[in-house]
A protein has these predicted regions:
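Short, surface-exposed, charge-dense and proline/glycine-enriched linear segments
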Residues: 17-20, 28, 76-83, 133, ...
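Phosphate/oxyanion-binding active-site loops and adjacent basic polyanion-contact surfaces
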Residues: 23-34, 79-83, 213-225
Length: 231
């Protein structure tokens, strides 16, 4: 579930971040709203936040409360450049937040009872959107311009996220969780039906070759879930 109206909280949370740096309990509590939400979700095994592509105040508050995050990637230069911003920003937020919480007096700490007392977020991995390939004689052909960018991903992920966020300098962990091709009309169909793609049926408009694509999507998600579990 979600609503665009949540964006109206952006300025409020942004202003209260200044209170965190001043160790004001009000700003700390307001920026811990997602800590509080997760505390109320203890009957669930997993809680997922589907975030927009921004380093704004709402996403900051979400990330500080989460155990892990996954980043989507595209085969374009902007995705590569964004990794540095994500790594630097999240490292700074995490350090500032944990330092403030560690220095709270006992009275203020009691007001946060039942919530996590530090940000422990780790980078879990990335999923990239496959580019649309050219076809020649029925065979898909790679596009060198896209492949050049994709080849940079593992090293950039290691440098900006694995090392900065996870302190993983070994280079042994595979952070590529999987890739997703373009599913064209199945995506708006899924949104209109309020269902995941793998749950779409003829009632939702699935016909002909759509069924194979629904099965393909389900198989891809299974692969990604297994990779997440292994990481």
């Amino acid at each position: 579930a979600g609503s665009p109206k949540l964006a109206s909280s952006e300025d409020f949370l942004s202003g209260d971040w200044k209170d965190i740096k001043a160790q004001e309990i009000r700003g700390i509590r307001s920026n811990m709203l997602f800590f509080d939400l997760l505390r109320k979700c203890d009957e669930y095994d997993f809680v997922f936040f589907d975030m927009g592509p921004s380093l704004g105040a709402i996403n900051r508050a979400i990330l500080l409360a989460c155990d892990y995050f996954i980043t989507p990637m595209s085969s374009d230069l902007f995705s590569i450049l964004a990794l540095e911003n994500i790594g630097l920003s999240l490292s700074e937020w995490k350090m500032t937040f944990n330092k403030v919480l560690a220095n709270l007096n006992s009275e203020d700490r009691e007001g946060l009872e039942g919530m996590k007392q530090e940000c422990t977020i780790k980078f879990l991995g990335y999923i990239y959107q496959q580019y649309i390939t050219k076809t020649s004689d029925g065979n898909k052909r790679i596009v060198n311009a896209y492949e050049t960018i994709l080849r940079q991903l593992p090293a950039k992920i290691k440098e900006n996220l694995a090392e900065k966020i996870n302190c993983d300098f070994s280079g042994k962990q595979n952070y590529e969780l999987g890739s997703v091709p373009n599913f064209y009309s199945l995506i708006p169909m899924s949104q209109s039906a309020h269902k995941p793609v793998f749950a779409l049926t003829n009632v939702d408009g699935v016909v002909g070759a759509h069924y194979q694509k629904v099965k393909e999507y389900s198989d891809i998600i299974d692969t990604i879930v297994n990779a997440i579990y292994n990481n």
